[in-house]
């Protein structure tokens, strides 16, 4: 395979790739800078072992973290967490929010009951198939049916409908008003127990659903007024998928936590200083969120190389 063309070994045919491995491959297949002998040697070197990156720090990881934090993460987000898998990136964003909200409510004892805390999310969302995320995903029954889930508040998704000429085909202000009314109802029902509002800034699996900046700003306002964290799930849209490093930058409406994956190869979250409003948050309390491998060095090396390619070829311009 090469560039945007997939090669089928059985038929010896090439196919235009509109799949990109579930939107996880950002620069095409076998890019020359990925085949460079020096890079290939580095890749083979780190692939020979799989250290526990959360506890064993290597030069390769340090170089990657510096590159990602300075070349991909926008200013104002000093905290990072690395893991394998987009669903687990979202999962740990939720855990960070639950911990933050519990401490905001004065529940600092780790034995405290927090089962009343919930996550507000949208209809037609896809946030993964792991434990917490399964309660948020609601695209098709195939992916969530027969698995026990939490009954967390789910509200209308006010998506833009376009006519054939690109104009608005629906009363989007009315759709947003409906969503906001349902959000108000959810906050009234759950009082001060909504830990976070989570949204994909563009719903992919849910149907290529786009939202206006006005709605994202409304979510920002609710999160600020009701002491909830605003989480943007950019696992599918992030890392220049929209032309900018992160889709939310088109609207200049910053969340508190961003979950990323797919095109970044290694997955994870970056988080703003709002998390530091509570002491002993998950970035300060050792081991509160963790995994054995903390991502993969091979994925980190590949992600760093993608940053080189994107910058060298001006793909973000």
Question: Could you describe each region identified by the protein language model?
Answer:
Residues 1-317:
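Conserved N-terminal phosphate-binding loop of PLP-dependent enzymes in the Aspartate aminotransferase
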């Amino acid at each position: 395979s090469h560039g945007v063309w997939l090669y089928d070994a059985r038929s010896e045919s090439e196919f235009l790739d509109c799949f990109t491995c579930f939107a996880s491959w950002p620069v095409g297949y076998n890019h020359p800078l990925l085949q460079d002998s020096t890079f290939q040697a580095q890749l083979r070197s780190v692939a020979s072992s799989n250290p526990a990156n959360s506890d064993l720090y290597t030069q390769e990881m340090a170089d990657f973290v510096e590159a990602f934090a300075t070349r991909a993460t926008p200013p104002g987000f000093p905290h990072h967490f690395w893991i394998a898998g987009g669903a687990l990136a979202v999962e740990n964003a939720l855990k960070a929010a639950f911990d933050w909200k519990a401490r905001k409510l004065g529940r600092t004892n780790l034995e405290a009951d927090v089962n009343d805390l919930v996550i507000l999310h949208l209809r037609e969302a896809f946030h993964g198939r792991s434990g917490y995320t399964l309660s948020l995903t609601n695209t098709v029954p195939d992916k969530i049916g027969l698995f026990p889930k939490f009954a967390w508040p789910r509200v209308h998704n006010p998506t833009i409908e376009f006519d054939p000429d690109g104009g608005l085909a629906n009363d989007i202000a009315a759709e947003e008003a409906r969503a906001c009314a349902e959000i108000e109802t959810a906050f009234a029902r759950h009082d001060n127990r909504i830990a976070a509002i989570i949204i994909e800034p563009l719903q992919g699996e849910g149907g290529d659903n786009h939202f206006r900046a006005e709605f994202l700003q409304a979510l920002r306002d609710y999160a600020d007024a009701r002491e909830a964290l605003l989480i943007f799930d950019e696992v599918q849209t992030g890392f220049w998928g929209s032309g900018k490093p992160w889709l939310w930058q088109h609207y200049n409406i910053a969340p508190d936590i961003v979950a990323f994956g797919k095109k970044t190869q290694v997955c994870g979250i970056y988080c703003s200083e709002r998390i530091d409003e509570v002491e002993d948050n998950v970035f300060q309390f050792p081991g509160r969120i963790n995994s054995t491998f903390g991502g993969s060095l091979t994925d980190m090396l590949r992600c760093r190389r993608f940053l080189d390619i994107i910058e060298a070829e001006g793909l973000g311009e």
